[in-house]
């Protein structure tokens, strides 16, 4: 018997027999994966609703990348988590050969899309903070959309081989979804996935945020010191860094387990089974953590959540009169357009100067008529 067949049978035993016999683990897995599915579906749906409802997503590159990340997380939750949960709760794979291939393809597709998006947004934040004026022509919504198309295109290219990577095998009268490629080909593909889907994006993110933090926390604005614009930059950078760190932490054990299968001595026993289960739970939980981070860090996003909930719970909210501070009317992320904040400050100074030199005008009587939105029209 070849090493390839030995590994497939061992993994078949791990996926089917071991998981089915561990009844307590099956119950725990069902609860944990159900919680991940509910939180991820609701959380990412709210993120998408807030961004799309605000109408500002098309004018801000950071919000576009956050939207792209939420779409990737939402697809992962819907197309991957429910099916992967059955590996630990059922005796075998019950969804057929096609879904065996498609589910693992979507796992890697969305993982690539998330890692590439985080790398792109880290570069975007660095340019916005370090070169707010010079980078304005580059950091346009149109270019951000092009970057998103490139991200999904590259993700399709890198994840495409996984459509043929997995196969169904028969093990103890059960169908089990396991890798079907030869060992050498598996090593090449999984190593490339680790390098291009994890290592390189993490290096880009680390370099970008190291330079961003160094500049943001040490640079001194000679005009106004710690301005509102600079505080907003720090807050949104903090939020994106937290999201990125969570991605790195949650996906690292998943890659380590796969590499240990291929290159290390990783016996199939209860301990390694538990570690594999933990690595999957951490990777899948990452897709439901981002909305929680947005809600905890971003004041404007919390307001966006409340507005979405108020629209869902009560249709009468449309007839209410809200007095809102103009500076807080955008329910998106506090990133806003950091360069716009600087331009607003400059315009304010210019307007003050014009007011001083402008001759006084004769007072005139002015009549203002206000029509409330809930008044009956004639």
UniProtKB/Swiss-Prot annotation:
It is a multi-pass membrane protein. GO terms for cellular component: plasma membrane. Keywords: Disulfide bond, G-protein coupled receptor, Membrane, Receptor, Transducer, Transmembrane, Transmembrane helix. Disulfide bonds join 100-177. Its main location: membrane. One of its GO terms (biological process) is neuropeptide signaling pathway. One of its GO terms (molecular function) is G protein-coupled peptide receptor activity. Residues 1-30, 84-101, 165-187, 260-276 are extracellular. Coiled coil: none annotated. Belongs to the G-protein coupled receptor 1 family. Receptor for the hormone galanin. Receptor for the hormones spexin-1 and spexin-2. This is Galanin receptor 2b. It comes from Danio rerio. The lineage of its organism: Eukaryota, Metazoa, Chordata, Craniata, Vertebrata.
